Amino acid sequence: MAVVKSKPTSPGQRHVVKVVGQDLYKGKPYAPLLEKNSKSGGRNNNGRITVRHIGGGHKHHYRVIDFKRNKDGIPAKVERIEYDPNRSANIALVLYADGERRYILAPKNLSVGDRIQSGVDAPIKPGNSLPMRNIPVGSVVHAVELQPGKGAQMARSAGAYCQILARDGAYVTVRLRSGEMRRVQSEGRATIGEVGNAEHMLRQLGKAGANRWRGIRPTVRGVAMNPVDHPHGGGEGRTSGGRHPVTPWGTPTKGYKTRKNKRTDKFIVRRRNK
């Protein structure tokens, strides 16, 4: 991947930093693995906004990604690496020996022509998927399952990874990039290596319109609203809001902890770094 800074030929180009993948496939995606991706505009079935700042954006199909990696013992060859508009990571189209094609997350250093495999007998190399009980302690992995057979849920975005720190019976302890240490079931699968396209974090959109292309609408400050719309709204002239920062629903923000999932607290060994 190459990081390209644009010449300031216009105000919108002045701050643009693009991440260009010279090895990405230039053609159309594999049609049998495409699905309709409807836009909601952030509205629910009653037509009410349930998620703010969503709407518009370019149309695109959803690429069906194999997060379960359950074709054990059947080798596959990487046919091409593709851009995916639905995620920060790139994806790889792989052809299995039985003729089936699937999309997977493209790990770092995976290239066209490489061979990958799933199952307990798979070698420890980037792109191979194994149960975590079969992965050596200290290994770097991504696409980690929280529940065996459910599919990968952790470490799926560009440049993400976990490190296996310890193995204790039915659980392994992994460290996330945030610094959080967490116990996950050792029967769950993970893929060797870290997710590719780590340069994604260097990207700068350069103008507001680039966010609109992605379906992201503007975020209006509460102090710019009326009292009916936000706790910070109203007042004569410009104000600071007159109270500690809160969300539109009155919950404290900017550092206030809102995590309520006590059910999974027992799996978190150490909270993330601040």
Curated annotation (Swiss-Prot):
Q: How does it assemble?
A: Part of the 50S ribosomal subunit. Forms a bridge to the 30S subunit in the 70S ribosome.
Q: Which organism is it from?
A: Idiomarina loihiensis (strain ATCC BAA-735 / DSM 15497 / L2-TR)
Tell me which UniProt keywords the record has, alphabetically: Ribonucleoprotein, Ribosomal protein, RNA-binding, rRNA-binding
Per the similarity annotation, which family is this?
Belongs to the universal ribosomal protein uL2 family.
Any one GO BP annotation for this protein? cytoplasmic translation
Among NCBIfam families, the record links this protein to: rplB_bact (TIGR01171)
The answer, when asked if Aminoacyl-tRNA synthetase is one of the entry's keywords, is no
Question: Where are the stretches annotated Disordered?
Answer: 31-53, 223-263
Q: Does the keyword Iron apply?
A: no
Would you tell me the Gene Ontology cellular component terms?
large ribosomal subunit
Q: Where is the composition biased (Low complexity)?
A: 39-48
List GO molecular-function terms, semicolon-separated. rRNA binding; structural constituent of ribosome; transferase activity
What function does this protein fulfil?
One of the primary rRNA binding proteins. Required for association of the 30S and 50S subunits to form the 70S ribosome, for tRNA binding and peptide bond formation. It has been suggested to have peptidyltransferase activity; this is somewhat controversial. Makes several contacts with the 16S rRNA in the 70S ribosome.
PANTHER family tied to this protein: LARGE RIBOSOMAL SUBUNIT PROTEIN UL2M, RIBOSOMAL PROTEIN L2
State the protein's name: Large ribosomal subunit protein uL2
Signal peptide interval:
none
